[in-house]
From Swiss-Prot:
The active site is at 52 (nucleophile). This is tRNA pseudouridine synthase A. It catalyses: uridine(38/39/40) in tRNA = pseudouridine(38/39/40) in tRNA. It comes from Borreliella burgdorferi (strain ZS7). Substrate binds at residue 111. Disulfide bonds: none annotated. Formation of pseudouridine at positions 38, 39 and 40 in the anticodon stem and loop of transfer RNAs. The gene is truA. Belongs to the tRNA pseudouridine synthase TruA family. Its EC number is 5.4.99.12. Homodimer. InterPro entries: PsdUridine_synth_cat_dom_sf, PsdUridine_synth_TruA, PsdUridine_synth_TruA_a/b_dom, PsdUridine_synth_TruA_C, TruA/RsuA/RluB/E/F_N.
């Protein structure tokens, strides 16, 4: 059997996260069911990481093995015929070496967070964005974002249930950009703790909305105290943008 890599996109709104759960709809569950229909046998998939309930992906990476002889283009069409109605799309398929693992071979990951920062919008424009009524300062937000660059202990922005042995993560890029009525936060890191990006976002927004000192964010980061982090930002505005490999 050859190992197949798939680039996939999905709307996480209707799912209880990526990882399979016996009694709840998940992205992994839907893909494995689709593969079983085609392969006629159970297929286990592996991913670059697990997105939480409500979080979307533009280019998630998964791998799997199937025994049937089928051209990749035909496999892609067959999978999309099943998955598209469930808000999941196969973007690309290709063969990879058996030694490749979507999670452990990954070098960096990129996430984005979408903030709707305007009163002039249609109701559906907030579907995959976090609405903030107050006009936000891109300059203030970017000064806080600069604090994230480098290797830090992110205990403050970790979840109690996170089982990672080390809370140190390396952040390579973090920046806010204005795009029309939206403000987009982009962050690239070696990897991320459970709910880390949303916790960071919620804290930065709370500091900006309350007109607190920009230095407050750095103080909170360095405290390594979860109790100092502010309300975690909603999941519906978070996107896994891409995963980087050598």
């Amino acid at each position: 059997m050859k190992k197949i890599l798939a680039e996939i996109a999905y709307d996480g709104s209707i799912y209880h996260g990526f990882q399979i759960q016996p009694t709840k709809p998940t992205v992994q569950g839907e893909i494995e069911k689709a593969l079983m229909k085609i392969n006629k046998k159970k297929v286990k998939i592996h991913s670059s990481g697990r997105t939480d309930k409500g979080v979307h992906a533009k280019r998630q990476i998964i791998t799997f093995d199937i025994k049937i002889n089928i051209q990749l283009n035909n496999l892609k069409k067959a999978l999309n015929a099943i998955l598209l109605k469930n808000s999941i799309k196969i973007l690309k398929l290709r063969y990879v070496k058996n030694s490749f693992h979507p999670r452990f071979s990954a070098q960096k990951r990129k996430y984005s967070y979408c903030i709707l920062n305007s009163d002039n919008y249609y109701p559906w424009e907030g579907y995959q964005a976090h609405y903030v009524n107050k006009k936000l300062s891109i300059s203030n937000l970017n000064q806080m974002a600069k604090t994230l660059i480098g290797k830090h202990d992110f205990t403050t922005f970790s979840c109690i249930k996170d089982k990672s042995k080390s809370k140190f993560r390396h952040i390579y890029f973090a920046k806010f950009k204005k795009r029309g009525k939206y403000i987009i936060f982009e962050i690239i890191g070696s990897s991320f703790l459970w709910k880390m990006v949303r916790s960071i976002m919620g804290t930065m927004l709370d500091i900006e909305i309350k007109n607190e000192s920009i230095s407050t964010f750095e103080t909170i980061l360095k405290s390594k105290n979860r109790n100092l982090a502010r309300t975690t930002a909603p999941a519906n505005a978070l996107f896994l943008e891409r995963v980087y490999y050598e």
